[in-house]
Amino acid sequence: MKDLGFNTLRKHIKLEPERFYYDCDRYGMIVFQDLVNSGPYHYLRDTAIPTIGGKLATYHEAPSERRRNFFLIHGEETLRHLYNHPCIVLYTLFNEGWGQHDTQNLYRHFRAMDPSRIWNAASGWFKNSDSDVQSEHIYFGSLRMKAQGRRPLLLTEFGGYSCALEGHRFNLDEEYGYQKYRSREEFQGAL
């Protein structure tokens, strides 16, 4: 990845095998690590409407006590498991509202558990007052962002562009992307 010019990877709502973090430590790759979300996801509420700048709600229904406990215990175990990996410089609690609940209290709890890392309470939208950074996702329109307050501003997701190249496709029947390009030149020009 470094040979391609990348110095940071975001592990999006999943954990990797130990070897991944070891190699990132060894080669100096920065990791933004999401906690694994456990909660309801609604495409319209959590993705479609916020992507174009709207919101149906700023708070989500509280998950069951079992789900809340699972998120808390799994998050604590994740922090203990990954604590000695210096490649991880930032943790994200919730992505785009997926399973988001009790954000301020959870931010304070996990930040107290590991104050050595930067904490992103909500990546994308449904932001809270408690977070070390302001995280934005931009898929349509220009990549213009405006800081709110004094927190660092991060663009943590963008683009969604695709170009189906022969010999570089996993699924030959479907192509995913918000904006699709038919040639390498057209694709590179859009970036």
PLM regions and their residue ranges:
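N-terminal carbohydrate-binding accessory modules
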Residues: 1-2, 22
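Substrate-binding/catalytic cleft of secreted carbohydrate-active enzymes
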Residues: 8-191
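Phosphate-binding active sites in nucleotide-utilizing proteins
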Residues: 5
